Amino acid sequence: MTGRLADRVAFITGAARGQGRAHAVRMAREGADIIAVDIAGKLPSCVRYDSATPEDLAETVRLVEATGRRIISAVTDVRDFDGLRDVVGDGVAKLGRLDIIVANAGITAPQAWNEITPESFRDVMDINATGTWNTVMAGAQKIIDGGRGGSVILISSAAGMKFQPFMVHYTASKHAITGMARAFAAELGVHSIRVNSVHPGPVNTAMGSADMAGALANFTETSPHLANTLTPFLPIWVAEPEDIADTVCWLASDESRNITAAAIPVDQGSTQY
């Protein structure tokens, strides 16, 4: 621990496992207390991987507490603005302030353009785009009230800079997040709040499960010209959650104090292919 985030509090969504858990543990190791939420329950029917569980969220709590930091956790859906606002309010009352927001929660669903239904399009947009907006709106005023600025990090995707074949809804939602970060940065900068988006490529999480990979492979059999659209420059195709957490922690720290409205890829170069 180097104390880069000492005396700060971070609000993290989708914190039960994967990238969200990695963000929580990494920030705790750097001295931050954590407000952690996750749906920890059933995901929409278009999602091909298992949802997180309350036990997953409890494990995140255990790992954060093992660092010696405090954590407030709650089972909350990012589509529930009032629920998020209540969790943040409770967390600030108990932990004293809010300095960092990490809007990490999101879903993906491999579907060809003509297989996407109005329901699945709405589900992906509601969780990824509206859920991100809800997250920022639930916490931004608390950062302002703290009086010393802060950092908001929106987790987009390589698809939010380029595109992901066979995921029109996911691509649209992640581009929305990219634009949202810039727009929030423009208005929140007067309060010394920085807002940036992070754009991972493939990451070793439940979202990258064998079922997901198999579904995409089936699609590329019928559209082979799209098979290599996200080929990386580096020899590593799949990052670990901790790799993304390194970047997110840096954006939360004073080391990135002059960086805002930036879209930062952590994608092994795949968005440039």
Residue map of PLM features:
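Canonical Rossmann dinucleotide-binding motif of NAD(H)/NADP(H)-dependent dehydrogenases/reductases
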Residues: 3-41
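A conserved structural motif in NAD(P)-dependent oxidoreductases
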Residues: 232-244
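Short, small/polar-rich loop/turn modules that mediate ligand/substrate recognition or access, typified
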Residues: 189, 194, 259-261
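Residue(s) in the substrate-gating loop at a strand-loop-helix junction
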Residues: 157
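Substrate-binding pocket helix/loop in short-chain dehydrogenase/reductase
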Residues: 112-113, 117-122, 229
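Short C-terminal tail/terminal secondary-structure segment
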Residues: 162, 235-236, 248-249, 260-273
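Active-site helix of classical SDR
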Residues: 136, 173, 181
